[in-house]
């Protein structure tokens, strides 16, 4: 085998062992928001306590390279004012941080792409550290926005976050 042939075989072997992310465009049900996920999403629902009230939340998400990525949607009550929506989003944020004993470690401004929909303006991409269900340290980045009568949460959890994963995920958020 020549050196060139050996290098080709070695490169193919290395690439076969290197996990790659297969980013795909996803539109979670009941929203016009588009996002990128590195794997085929699963869908589910559960209740989340927001303020003093249990609220139904629909989720779409998947796991890839040790990261859990999800889009969650909480419908607002009919006739909710913008102030009530923002208060509910803040309460959901507090509940999400409390669920994994999270402490905010930083924030970044995030501007979501928008073609025709009213742009929600700059959002806060929150970084936090906490404890996972297994009792081990967990990192997270999350953002909330109010759109189409619902609060939308985009979130990534991992023992150690990869900037490639989080940056691609949040950059992929887009309104129509």
Predicted feature residues:
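Bacterial N-terminal signal peptides that target proteins for export
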Residues: 1-7
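C-terminal motif of bacterial Sec signal peptides marking the signal peptidase cleavage site
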Residues: 13-16
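Bacterial signal peptide processing site
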Residues: 18-20
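Post-signal peptide N-terminal segment of mature Sec-exported envelope proteins
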Residues: 25-49, 53, 64-65
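A structural detector for beta-sheet-dominated domains
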Residues: 29, 38, 113, 129-131, ...
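Surface-exposed amphipathic alpha-helical segments
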Residues: 41-42, 88-104, 148-176
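Conserved polar/disulfide-associated segments of primarily extracytoplasmic proteins
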Residues: 47-139, 151
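A short, surface-exposed beta-strand/turn
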Residues: 141-148
């Amino acid at each position: 085998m020549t050196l060139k042939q050996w290098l080709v075989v070695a490169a193919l072997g290395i690439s076969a062992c290197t996990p790659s992310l297969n980013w795909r465009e996803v539109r979670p049900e009941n929203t016009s928001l588009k996002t990128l996920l590195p794997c085929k999403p699963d869908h589910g629902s559960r209740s989340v306590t927001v303020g003093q009230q249990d609220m139904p939340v629909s989720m779409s998400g998947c796991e890839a390279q040790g990261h859990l990525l999800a889009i969650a949607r909480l419908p607002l009550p009919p006739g909710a004012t913008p102030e009530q929506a923002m208060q509910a989003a803040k309460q959901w944020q507090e509940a999400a941080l409390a669920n994994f004993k999270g402490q905010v470690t930083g924030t970044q401004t995030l501007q979501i792409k928008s073609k025709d929909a009213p742009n929600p303006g700059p959002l806060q991409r929150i970084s936090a550290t906490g404890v996972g269900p297994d009792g081990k340290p967990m990192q997270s980045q999350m953002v909330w926005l109010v759109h189409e009568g619902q609060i939308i949460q985009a979130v990534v959890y991992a023992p150690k976050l990869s900037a490639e994963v989080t940056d691609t995920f949040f950059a992929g958020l887009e309104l129509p």
